[in-house]
């Protein structure tokens, strides 16, 4: 059950669908120009390329299981039904009332990990391997916290622009045009 937990969390931080996790091979882990490790795959569902930079937490999970597969796969992923059964037990053990699904990890990556932290939707779309940004927009339900943070940032930016400060508007003594009021 702990392996299924780790795999689910790996997907929460990479956005991989179950089948793409199952098929993930060492050859899909690449080092790019930024010297970071990236997952580069063609999604089974769409054939679209997905490029996902590995954050520290999924790297740690990957290292925990590396070398356990002899067929080049990164993880020894059990079959889908076995994973779903374990996921249901994990949810109950954690007091989660809504039944967990593997797709929830992908959704969590898109919303909680990326969009809520300011990652542009175009970038999220690329990482998820979507063909059309409209597909990604399904995930883009904004949280109240994100909305509040964004409006506060906007307010600070506007307040930093001297022309728009309330004081300059009210203290302007140029209320005359050609000497007339």
Q: Residue locations for each model-derived region?
A:
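Basic, Lys/Arg- and aromatic-enriched nucleic-acid-binding interface segment
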Residues: 1-18, 68
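Short basic/aromatic active-site micro-motif
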Residues: 2-5, 77-80, 97-117, 130
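C-terminal catalytic core of tyrosine-transesterase DNA break-rejoin enzymes
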Residues: 9, 13, 19-20, 89, ...
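Short, polar N-cap/turn motifs at the start of nucleic acid-interacting alpha helices
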Residues: 28-34, 97-98, 118-138, 149, ...
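Catalytic-site neighborhood detector that most strongly recognizes the C-terminal catalytic loop/helix
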Residues: 43-47, 80, 128-153
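C-terminal catalytic core of Y-nucleophile DNA break-rejoin enzymes
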Residues: 44-63, 69-89, 101
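C-terminal secondary-structure termini that scaffold catalytic or DNA-interacting sites
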Residues: 154-181
């Amino acid at each position: 059950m702990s392996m299924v937990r780790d795999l689910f969390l790996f997907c929460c931080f990479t956005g991989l669908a179950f089948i793409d996790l199952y098929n993930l091979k060492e050859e899909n882990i690449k080092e790019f120009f930024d010297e970071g490790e990236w997952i580069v795959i063609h999604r089974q569902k769409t054939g679209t390329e997905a490029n996902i930079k590995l954050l520290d937490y999924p790297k740690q999970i990957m290292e925990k299981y590396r070398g356990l597969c002899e067929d080049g796969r990164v993880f020894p992923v059990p079959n889908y039904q076995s994973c779903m059964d374990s996921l249901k037990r994990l949810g109950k053990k954690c007091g989660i009332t809504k039944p967990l699904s593997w797709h929830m990890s992908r959704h969590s990556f898109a919303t909680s990990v990326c969009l809520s932290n300011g990652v542009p939707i175009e970038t999220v779309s690329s990482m998820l391997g979507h063909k059309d940004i409209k597909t990604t927009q399904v995930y883009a339900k904004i949280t109240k916290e994100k909305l509040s943070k964004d409006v506060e940032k906007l307010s600070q930016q506007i307040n930093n622009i001297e022309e728009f400060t309330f004081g300059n508007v009210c203290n302007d003594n140029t209320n005359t045009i050609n000497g007339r009021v």
